[in-house]
């Protein structure tokens, strides 16, 4: 028995991430010995049949050794109650219950502590689990689950139904009569142990045995892990029918976590060092062995608050994942890794490859304890992990200020946005007046008279002099011209989601796909692009005939309103971009297919209608445009509007852009782009360069980015504008925060495309409230 000194982290920080608090070597192999951890104690078998209890609160206490088993101990578990703290151990001969406090008192008095024998079995017990009140205990032996009464020391019920050995079992916290088990038959079952009946049986989840089980009480979810490093999260809410919420591959999540950190480091370095970092990233991205899920434990991760130098008041619900070579912290809201601790990075650890693992962390605590047994040796070690030090090393490096959608500084003279401001700051009044006179003459219809008379032969019409109206009656009513048909109503926060179909309109006589749609800024118009080359504009109430815009030779793929609601932008599969006049329903600006080398995938108005922002191939382009309102009635077919490319920038990876987004309702310097390499890149057009890269945002390329662009009817916190959504085929919808480039939440939707409405369903997803999102600490 030895207790080595504290070991500093390998990254050069003076604050130790991992401290090996206790090490013991057993006479028997410690490859798969059962381990148990509580908030104050750690229990493990020593030399096969001796049960040892180590105090994590006061390591100076003598190691408590409990003897009573004659065979190898195969299962150990602590009770859920603190006073008294119960400990149960099982072997092939006995199942013994121990009172930890009484056993320690007897040891201090020189007496031999004795436990209570609950029963004797001839089969190997693989799992033990107490109920919440410690009055019952579930014993898993073979494919059978026995629920025993602790006080009466009798078997209450036996549950049979698994085809393989039961590996883990849990009591449901909010349903006292419900018990859930997983087995080597690769399925989980839900039982009512009061009546001894089976409630639900899942299908086979994987080709590998299920090893662990955890119930998240706050979200009412079931988490189970397999031997090949896969996690399944199922909903236990009433009416959800145990549907799968998420499927997590720990190995892929670890690769994504590592790639994002290295991409962030690459963006923060000078350009001459980026090639070397990319080469190192390719070398580190080699495939490794899978991570078997040895243990699962809850973790209330309090993110560091840079302003206070402590922990934030709000904690993120996470999950400890113990594997053979590493420990991981998984965010249960976003299903992304918050931290990864690899044993090989700490060479002085006694256990480098674990055969068994157990973890525990107290709520609102900065420390966690982990217990490991050596796979290829006989050592058992207790590690103390400093969460604050671990998280500080796991943060993405960032060079410069924190990103924000709201512009926090003036436009730089070197910015491409500076061009548009200069041109509009000093308008030429003389030219404006001439255009106005010219438009009055040219906009008149052309009329051919049958009789032409010379001037002077007819009398001029009498002009009516101005006479003010003095008999106007005011009825405290607004003119019908300015009458607002949409009355403001106070919406209930509890029932604000629409649930019933209000109105349905057919956009065409034949079935046609609605490929895109967008409301105008005031919410009174709805534009949609169709697969039959048309663009339609409806009233928000879908009443009356729509305005039709025809001109594309292919399906309309993008449609966008201008901020002043005068113009409508559309792109189609004919590789053209068109700007329409909403009032005239006429084409005002045309970008031919040969304007760009590759098709335009996304386009929108930008910077309060000053520019047109579009993507073509691997780069996005900023266009300065001018709409000529002076139209010759004879040459109506020939638009005189013009455009000029002023700035373009490619993605860092060189991948083609699949979607882009920027705010047009107010001045913002941020542009978001998504590429076919499954990455999202953030560009700062004030600096004219890339600001950040989010690697492997989805398992498939992102086909849609949606930002919080504000509303004229709802007041929001300024930080709420930094939230944006991404969607990918078959990979759900994810909510991100631009301030720290973190995934905040993830939802799964059945529709393939969130903007295609043919043969799909519209699902309203509930996200975390604004207060919950704003309560998260800002990045340093």
From Swiss-Prot:
Pfam families given in the database record: WD40
Q: Which InterPro entries match?
A: Quinoprotein_ADH-like_sf (IPR011047), WD40/YVTN_repeat-like_dom_sf (IPR015943), WD40_repeat_dom_sf (IPR036322), WD40_rpt (IPR001680), WDR27 (IPR042411)
Q: Where are the WD repeats?
A: 3-56, 61-100, 111-150, 154-193, 200-236, 291-335, 342-385, 500-540, 544-582, 588-639, 644-685, 691-738, 752-779
Q: Does the keyword Translocase apply?
A: no
Per UniProt, the keywords (alphabetical) are: Repeat, WD repeat
The identity of this protein, by name, is WD repeat-containing protein 27
What is the protein's species of origin? Mus musculus
High-level lineage: Eukaryota, Metazoa, Chordata, Craniata, Vertebrata
């Amino acid at each position: 028995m030895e207790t080595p000194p504290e070991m500093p982290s390998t990254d050069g920080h003076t604050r130790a991430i991992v401290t090996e608090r206790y090490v013991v070597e057993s006479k028997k192999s410690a490859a798969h010995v059962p381990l148990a951890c509580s908030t104050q104690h750690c229990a493990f078998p020593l030399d096969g049949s001796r049960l040892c209890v180590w105090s994590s609160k006061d390591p100076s206490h003598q190691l408590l050794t409990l003897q009573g088993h004659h065979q190898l101990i195969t299962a150990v578990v602590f009770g859920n109650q603190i006073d008294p703290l119960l400990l149960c151990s099982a072997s092939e001969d006995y199942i013994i219950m121990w009172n930890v406090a009484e056993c320690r008192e007897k040891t201090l008095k020189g007496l031999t502590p004795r436990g209570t024998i609950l029963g004797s079995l001839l089969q190997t017990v693989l799992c033990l689990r107490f109920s919440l009140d410690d009055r019952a205990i579930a014993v898993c032996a073979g494919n059978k689950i026995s629920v025993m009464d602790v006080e009466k020391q009798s078997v209450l019920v036996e549950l049979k139904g698994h085809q393989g050995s039961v590996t883990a079992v849990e009591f449901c916290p909010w349903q006292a009569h419900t018990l859930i088990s997983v087995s080597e038959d690769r399925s989980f079952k839900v039982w009512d142990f009061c009546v001894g009946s089976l409630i639900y049986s899942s299908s086979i989840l994987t080709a590998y045995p299920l090893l662990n089980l955890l119930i998240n009480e706050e979200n009412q979810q079931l988490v189970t892990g397999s031997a090949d490093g896969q996690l399944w999260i199922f909903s236990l809410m009433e009416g959800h029918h145990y549907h799968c919420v998420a499927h997590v591959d720990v190995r892929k999540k670890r690769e994504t976590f590592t790639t994002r950190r290295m991409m962030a480091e690459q963006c923060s370095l000078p350009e001459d060092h980026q090639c070397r970092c990319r080469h190192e990233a390719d070398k580190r991205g080699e495939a490794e062995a899978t991570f078997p899920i040895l243990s699962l434990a809850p973790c209330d991760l309090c993110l560091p608050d840079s302003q206070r130098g402590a922990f934030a008041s709000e904690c993120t619900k996470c999950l400890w994942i113990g594997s053979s070579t590493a420990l991981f912290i998984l965010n249960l809201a976003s299903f992304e890794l918050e931290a990864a601790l690899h044993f090989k990075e700490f060479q002085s650890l006694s256990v480098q490859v674990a055969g068994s693992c157990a973890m525990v962390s107290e709520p609102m605590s900065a420390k966690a304890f982990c217990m490991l047994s050596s796979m290829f040796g006989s050592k058992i070690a207790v590690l103390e992990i400093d969460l604050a030090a671990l998280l500080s090393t796991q943060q993405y490096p960032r060079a410069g200020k924190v990103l924000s959608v709201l512009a926090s500084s003036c436009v730089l003279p070197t910015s491409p946005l500076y061009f548009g401001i200069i041109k509009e700051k000093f308008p030429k009044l003389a030219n404006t007046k001439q255009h106005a006179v010219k438009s009055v003459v040219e906009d008149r219809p052309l009329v051919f008279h049958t009789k032409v008379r010379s001037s002077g032969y007819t009398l001029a019409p009498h002009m009516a002099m101005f006479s003010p109206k003095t008999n106007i009656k005011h009825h405290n009513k607004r003119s019908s011209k300015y009458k607002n048909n949409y009355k403001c109503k106070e919406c209930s926060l509890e029932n604000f989601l629409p649930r019933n179909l209000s109105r349905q309109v057919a956009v065409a006589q034949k079935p046609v796909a609605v490929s895109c749609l967008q409301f105008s800024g005031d919410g009174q118009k709805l534009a949609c692009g169709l697969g039959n080359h048309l663009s339609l504009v409806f009233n928000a109430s879908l009443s009356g005939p729509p305005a039709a815009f025809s001109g594309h030779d292919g399906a309309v793929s993008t449609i966008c309103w201008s901020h002043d609601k005068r113009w409508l932008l559309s792109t189609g599969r004919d590789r053209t971009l068109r700007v329409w006049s909403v009032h005239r329903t006429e084409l005002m600006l045309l970008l031919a297919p040969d304007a760009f080398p590759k098709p335009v995938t996304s386009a929108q108005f930008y910077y309060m209608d000053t520019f047109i922002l579009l993507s073509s191939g691997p780069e996005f382009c900023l266009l300065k445009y001018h709409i000529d309102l002076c139209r010759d009635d004879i040459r109506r077919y020939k638009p005189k509007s013009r455009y000029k490319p002023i700035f373009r920038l490619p993605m860092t990876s060189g991948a083609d852009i699949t979607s882009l987004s920027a705010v047009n309702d107010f001045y913002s310097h941020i542009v978001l782009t998504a590429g076919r390499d499954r990455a999202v890149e953030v560009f700062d057009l004030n600096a004219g360069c890339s600001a950040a890269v989010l690697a492997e945002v989805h398992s498939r390329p992102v086909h849609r980015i949606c930002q919080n662009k504000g509303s004229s009817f709802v007041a929001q916190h300024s930080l709420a504008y930094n939230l944006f959504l991404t969607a990918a085929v078959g990979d759900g919808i994810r909510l991100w925060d631009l301030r720290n480039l973190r995934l905040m939440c993830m939802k799964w939707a059945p529709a393939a495309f969130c903007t295609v409405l043919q043969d799909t369903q519209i699902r309203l997803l509930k996200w975390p409230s604004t207060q919950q999102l704003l309560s998260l600490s800002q990045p340093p």
